[in-house]
Regions:
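Flavin-dependent oxidoreductase catalytic cores
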Residues: 1-271
Length: 271
């Protein structure tokens, strides 16, 4: 039977209730605000963020009661928890230092893990690099420009395993609303990237691999193989063989060819 995971997310900057933009942001981001307007009134308060922590526990209980096998606390792709990861300039309990920026993620996971047992797991999707230079993105240092610096992402995955008891995470990169080519390398899309898709594939799998090798006890699922289309299965097999990940999550491929996994099992390859 399929292993069903319910994703728990706060849309943050991309909140769209009633099909009307209503951004809720961690801090003002001049680059992202070129794509979607926001102002100081959109910045969420510490009290609001604190109130969200238990919401992830409530979501876990609902997911468990609905028959899901796991809940995934989402901290990637430009949504609220991921934006807090780069809230270096935000004052208060949810910004500035590493501990504050990941307070909501960690406390949300703790609230969800109350309902964990042999039949229900808590996991997370974690963005390890946004694609922007400091101070506008996570996974970089003040000195690294837009080159990934995985010191903090590696620390986070270590702590998710050692402190919170997470056994499994999915790692990913980028913001599909803005740095789409970082999240999912492509050769046909809404803009022309300034790099070959292979560059994005390499950055993704080797970045994830660096974290996996630093935290080998964590089961790590990698992301974004679909650009390779019919060769994505071979890419995945090689990544697992080289110890860069324990498995791969497919997004676009699953939409385009929902039966692709059965094709691999039955025929040995994606058709």
């Amino acid at each position: 039977a399929p292993y069903l995971i319910m994703q728990a997310n706060h849309s943050g900057r991309y909140s769209n209730p009633g099909n009307k933009p209503a951004p809720m942001i961690a801090y003002r981001h001049p680059i992202l605000e070129q794509y979607r307007a926001a102002d100081d009134s959109c910045i969420v308060t510490d009290d609001y963020l604190k109130g969200l922590e238990e919401k992830f526990g409530e979501a876990a209980l609902l997911a468990k009661e609905a028959g899901f096998d796991a809940i995934d606390i989402k901290s990637c792709h430009g949504y609220l928890l991921a934006e807090l990861a780069s809230a270096y300039s935000r004052p208060g309990e949810y910004g500035g230092c590493f501990e504050n920026r990941f307070r909501l993620l960690k406390n949300g996971i703790r609230a969800a893990k109350v309902y964990e047992d042999d039949s229900f797991m808590v996991t997370a999707r974690v963005g390890i690099y946004d694609g922007y230079a400091y101070p506008w993105g996570f996974g970089v240092s003040p000195e690294s420009g837009t080159t990934p610096d995985l010191t903090e992402p590696t620390r986070l995955v270590h702590e998710l395993h050692d402190e919170l008891g997470l056994d499994m995470v999915n790692l990913t990169m980028g913001n599909p609303y803005a740095t789409t080519h970082v999240t999912r390398p492509f050769d046909f899309g809404k803009y022309e990237p300034d790099e070959h898709p292979f560059v994005g594939l390499s950055r993704m799998i080797h970045g994830i691999g660096a974290v996996k090798k630093a935290v080998p006890e964590m089961t790590v699922w990698a992301s974004a193989p679909s650009y390779l289309r019919a060769y994505a299965d071979l890419f995945t097999a090689g990544a697992v063989e080289q110890g860069l990940c324990d498995g791969m999550l497919f997004g676009r491929m699953a939409f385009a060819d929902p039966d692709f996994a059965n094709e691999i099992v039955k025929n040995g390859r994606i058709d």
